[in-house]
Regions:
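Conserved alpha/beta-hydrolase catalytic His-Asp/Glu region
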Residues: 123-126, 138-191
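Gly/Ala-rich beta-loop-alpha elbow adjacent to hydrolase catalytic centers
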Residues: 90-94, 98
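Flexible "cap/lid" loop of the alpha/beta hydrolase fold
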Residues: 99-104, 110-139
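Short beta-strand/loop motif that positions the catalytic acidic residue
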Residues: 191, 197-199
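Acidic catalytic loop of the alpha/beta-hydrolase fold
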Residues: 202-206
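Catalytic active-site module of serine/aspartate enzymes centered on a nucleophile-bearing elbow/loop
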Residues: 221-259
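Conserved HGGG/HGGXW glycine-rich cap/lid loop of the alpha/beta-hydrolase fold
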Residues: 7-57
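Active-site loop/oxyanion-hole signature of alpha/beta-hydrolase fold enzymes
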Residues: 37, 49-89, 244
């Protein structure tokens, strides 16, 4: 457990080598990254997966919390582990936390990984937000939830039922408020960090053209990798491809990972 102020964070840690931090999607926990974390650890990286406040054993207040506060949680984890600046990778909502951390605490961030990132300056449209809420509503009929998840998270041919479990609606609502309280212009550029942008091929929230626009805006420090046959839930649809992209990029940051 990592404690800072009145926040206590459960951190799933594995592997040895340079640090890669994995931050999960809106209303979901660090175990979504299980197959990816295993592959990264096997590739000789130290993998840290902090559970967000309210998930697992992590606790902390939500009243008045902004994106900056969630980034401070991750800063505390990296400082506690004391293994040097980290490659901080955020899936979906986690990408904003990663970018905010790189903005506020650049000395802790070797690079930023954006996975299925909605980097636009505006929130998701109402129909998408409604589908996300339905997906996380465990009291709704499974058929309605699967339909919503298929629309907003999964590519054609993928089985959305794999995400029926693992939702934390109260955390989702609190994270959404925290994100809305912080203007997107603040974290947009991820400070001055190098950025790996992992773009799903069929994402209704984060479009391929958004990735290209982001690269044009920030220039050569952005590397875009498109993952075929995937949508917003790319980390569970294509864990091997996502892992391979992360490992290849991490090797450019640390050409010879420490043993």
């Amino acid at each position: 457990m990592v404690t800072h102020g009145d926040v206590r964070l459960e951190v799933l840690a594995q592997g040895e080598g340079p640090t890669i931090v994995l931050l999960p999607s809106l209303g979901r926990g660090a175990t979504d990254f299980d197959p990816i974390a295993e592959r990264l650890a096997d590739a000789r990286f130290r993998v840290l997966r902090p559970q967000p406040r309210g998930i697992g054993k992590s606790t902390g207040p939500w009243q008045g919390v902004k994106l900056e506060d969630l980034a401070a949680d991750i800063a505390a984890v990296i400082e506690h582990d004391n293994n040097g600046p980290a490659f901080v990778v955020g899936h979906a909502f986690g990408n904003r936390v990663a970018r905010m951390l790189a903005t506020a605490r650049p000395e802790l961030v070797r690079a930023v990984g954006l996975v299925a990132a909605n980097v636009g300056h505006n929130p998701s449209p109402p129909d998408v937000r409604t589908a996300i809420r339905t997906s996380a509503n465990t009291s709704a009929p499974d058929d309605d939830r699967v339909k919503a998840m298929q629309f907003v998270f999964f590519a054609p041919g993928s089985d959305a039922r794999v995400w029926l479990d693992g939702w934390h609606p109260e955390v989702l609502a609190a994270q959404r408020i925290a994100g809305d309280l912080t203007p997107r212009t603040i974290d947009y550029a991820a400070g001055r960090a190098p950025v790996l942008y992992i773009q799903p091929s069929h994402d209704p929230l984060a479009h391929v053209e958004d990735a290209e626009e982001y690269r044009r805006a920030l220039g050569d420090r952005v590397t875009v990798v498109v993952i075929p046959n995937s949508a917003h839930a790319v980390i569970v649809e294509q864990p091997e491809a996502v892992s391979a992209a992360l490992i290849a990029y991490a090797h450019t940051l640390w050409p010879s990972p420490r043993k």
